Design a protein with these regions (language model features):
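Internal, active-site/partner-interface "lid" segment
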Residues: 137-146, 156-201
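Short glycine/serine/threonine-rich phosphate/pyrophosphate-binding segments
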Residues: 56-59, 83-86, 107-113, 136-139
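Short, acidic/small-residue loops that bind anionic groups at enzyme active sites
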Residues: 71-76, 120-145
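N-terminal amphipathic/basic leader segments beginning at the initiator methionine
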Residues: 1-47, 198-201
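Short glycine-rich or small-residue beta-strand-to-loop segments that form or flank ligand, phosphate
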Residues: 2, 45-52, 68-71, 97-106, ...
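Glycine-rich oxoanion-binding loops at beta->alpha junctions
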Residues: 55, 64-95
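Gly-rich Lys/Arg/Thr-decorated short loops/hinges at beta-loop-alpha junctions or inter-strand turns
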Residues: 42-50, 59-72, 136-139
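Gly/Ser/Thr-rich loops at beta-strand to alpha-helix junctions
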Residues: 52-57, 103-111, 147-152
Length: 201
């Protein structure tokens, strides 16, 4: 495996800042993640996505015109904190409310949910749409327990397109939910992941 990093402990932060440095015309670093460096329409919905680092180009690579307005990035394979989510969402807010969308994982549900409560307390309308596309993680009778993996992209893109069109927060939520309802995926890995600084598995 090819490795491009300095200190393994600094890998997520260096990857984030490196991506921003390479794409200053599109991205801006904020505490906890990245937001668009370009202007969005005033009073439009901001779509904020996120999750653990290590699944590149997700999540920062999904920020830009026609995609998300911001991405929250936790540590490697770890949910971002509620403070990180709150910070990125505040920076991405255009005045039309915020849609938080992410894969259905316990840590993400907890932390994004807490951040949503803080945003609402600040007077910022905020809704959540979980991505639940992974058919291997739960049976059809337990759709709400399915994880979100590759289907993230479909849901994020649909929500972002609705926001770009000027739809309201409620309408963007409905578009995202419908995209999630229509999306299924099945992941296959040929070998295990390799963490920075760890020996190949």
């Amino acid at each position: 495996m090819t490795r491009l990093f300095n200190d393994p402990n600094d890998f997520p932060e260096e990857a984030r800042l490196g991506l921003v440095a390479a794409h200053r015309d599109k991205l801006m670093a904020v505490p906890g993640g990245v937001v668009r460096s370009t202007r969005s329409q005033p009073d439009s919905v901001a779509v904020v996505v996120g999750g653990g680092s290590g699944h590149y180009p997700t999540f920062a690579g999904l920020v830009g015109q026609g995609l998300a307005h911001g991405a929250v990035m936790g540590n490697l394979f770890c949910s971002p904190s509620a403070q990180q989510v709150y910070s990125v969402a505040k920076a991405a807010n255009n005045g039309g409310g915020v849609l938080l969308s992410f894969g259905n994982y316990a840590g993400d549900v907890l932390h994004f949910g807490e951040a949503r409560e803080r945003l609402i307390a600040d007077g910022i309308p905020c809704e959540i749409v979980l991505v639940t596309d992974d058919v291997a993680s739960a049976p059809l009778a337990e759709l709400d327990k399915r994880r979100g993996i590759a289907g993230d992209l479909t849901v994020f893109k649909a929500a972002a397109a609705a926001a770009e069109k000027g739809l309201s927060l409620e309408e963007v939520v409905q578009v995202a939910k419908e995209a999630n309802r229509c999306t299924r995926s099945f992941g296959v890995a040929f070998e295990g992941c390799t963490l920075p600084g760890a020996a190949d598995s």
